[in-house]
Each structure stands twice: as structure tokens, then as C-alpha cells.
């Protein structure tokens, strides 16, 4: 059966500053934690990325031409404040004013994120989000942006608190590359939620025009054996780590007692430690009802089996299917069920998980006013056809199938009462990916990273028709 989306449903592509802009040393931009981390550990760098810093006019033209009426972008904190605080760099401010003006000229509304994984180097080395003082710096940066860029109508404070903390302190594939530091993970979770809440209250108190929210990466967790109480418990614990701790903190304004007891058990099973949340519930409680939306980034779901052995995580950053492993003592292990497909990077493809997550948000958090799917997409090892002189289209039918299936469950959720207002495909064009460099491609538009030429994909044509008709076919 053909499904449709509401006429006011918005469509666009998503990007992020460090992944798209390139130009990491241009016009006085300060260094971020990733610059040193990549230099010391990898063969790829944050340059050239998609060179959005110089190509944004072309990319926004493509966004408009292929049906996008919104775009997700982020401000590079270190383009505004090269050191994270103190001196403002006028060149960076001017760039974003020009970028937003071009968005307006192209009738593409920007949803602007303040922090998307790119903490300035000095702040990162001085404790990053483990310290309350760095959240002061974040709030001051947010305040500056709210006042400097009144042309922005939609603000996102922080992108994917969970991903930042897990990759920095559990998996170790983000700087500073710690592993199994659950105390640091929970501390970072909490501090970022406090910073987010303070920024929201500041935005509302100052009477800034527009809307503000946060983006959470949410995934649905299922027991591997639905009849096994131990597997059910593992799924519930993983859900606490992936979803409940963060969404409760954001929209309930506190962590329930049973959550804190589970946190203590997880810490005890993994080298102990503790984190400090005293006297800060006032901030997150004050913001819980005044946020305008939540962004949901959805890529995968997980099936969990009980496990109490040694914690071990192997991250698949190469695209060699079947090489990942996640086993966490006191929580559980991820186990692939029969019949569930995965990407080359072992991300489970399960659209029903998005429906289940949307409906849980609707049912469990009635103070969430509306939802945007702020990232959804699939990475492939895309190539341009060999006969590119006559055929410059990337043939990515599997991506169309993936996006179509996820949009269909979004339509189902809307029909069942969920207030989902828009969809951002990750990504507008190919971008640098944090732990895969330039081999994993998501874009509606293929980027030749040597020449910076853009080539459309079949998905781009399909997406254009979708945006024009709102019919999923």
C-alpha cells in the first residue's frame, strides 16, 4: 500500500561542521580535539572533507534543486572562539552569516547545531565535558550565537550526547580514546544535559525568537530470547545506557531511583568509580517542559543476550562485515538474530525499531511537543560508474530501499498519533566520517574528494520526487 506524509512534513539533508567544512586551518579557525587525534592515529584527516567552507553555495543549490526545504548544519565552535573562549574570530562569524544568508536565498531553512563532536582542543585537554567549568564555556558560546545569529530560527544545542560519551570513554574510538570508563561516560552524559538545559533556559529567558531542542541518538533494544528473563534484563540495561538515562534527564528532569541503582551496578561490574550529580537537578528540571522539539537520530537497533564475562568491544571501522563485537560485563552482549541484515559496518537494518522508538517517545514523554528525525541513512562503499563521461549517477538502489522502509514506518507512527514533523537524510553530500575516513559514504551526492566534484545519486532523484509529492513509492 502506498503511504503518504503530511503536507507540512519537511525534508532535507544533514551535515556537520567538522565532517563537511574542511578548511581546518583557514581564516583563523582554532584546533579541535580531532585534529591531534587524527594526526597521531590515522592516515586520514579532517581536510579536505567536502570543503563545504568553500562549496556551500553549490551544495545549497543542490539541496534546493533536489527538493530539500531544510538542512542540518553545525557551527564550528573553534571558528567563532578559536580557543573555546575569550577572543572572537570575525572571519568565522562572517562565514556563518554568509552561509545563513545563502540558505535564505535558496529557501532552505537551517537547523543549526551548536556542538557536533568538535570540542576546541584547549577545552578538551582541560577536562572537556567531564568538568562543570567547560559547561560554563559551552553556555557562554551558546549565548553568543543566540545573540549574533538572530536569523537562525531552529537551534539544536548538542548532537548525540550518548555517542560522544560512549565513543570517548567506552569504545575508545573518539579522543581521548579511553575504554570502559563508565564513570566518565555517565559524568559526561549528565554534564552535557546540564549544559543543554542551561542553554535552553537562557534562550527562552532572553526572549530569543525561534525554536530550540536537542538531538539524541536513540536505538531500540530487544531481548535475544524473549522468553529468557536474563536476556530481558540485558535489553533493559542496554536501554538504560542507550536511551532512558538521557531521555529521562532531558524530559523528566531527573533520573528515577531504579535507574540510579542500575547505574551503580554497572559501575561496580566495570572497575567502580562514581560521578557527581549533586545540586544540579534544578537546571534539568527547569528545562524539561520548555523545549520545542527533540531530534531523533536513528540508524540501528540491538538484540541483547545476558553476559557476565570480561568486557570486550571491537569496533568495525573498516567495513569488513562481521568483525564487530560488543560484550559488556554486568550488562550483556549484542547478538545478531537470524533474518536481520546488516551493513558492511555491522549496523543492523531494522526499520521497525524506528517505529517502536517513536511510539515510545510519544507514550512515555508527553511533554515532547514534536519530533524530527534528524539523521537516518545508510553507508555504502559507493563509486561513480566507470563510464562517468556519459553516466555520472551513483546507482544506489539499496539506499532508496533503506530510506523508503524507514519513511514508511514514520508514516505509520504519524498515523498512530506521533507528531513527527520532518526527516533529514544523513547526509546531504558525502562527508568525512569520524572512524572510517573517506571510505564510508552516505550522501545524496557523491563527492570526489580529490576534485571536490559532486555527482547525484539515484536516491537524490527519488528524494526529489518524494519531497515534491510526499508520496512514498
From Swiss-Prot:
It comes from the Bacteria. This is 6-phospho-beta-galactosidase. GO terms for biological process: lactose catabolic process via tagatose-6-phosphate. The keyword Heme does not apply. GO terms for cellular component: cytosol. Signal peptide: none annotated. It catalyses: a 6-phospho-beta-D-galactoside + H2O = D-galactose 6-phosphate + an alcohol. It comes from Lactobacillus acidophilus.
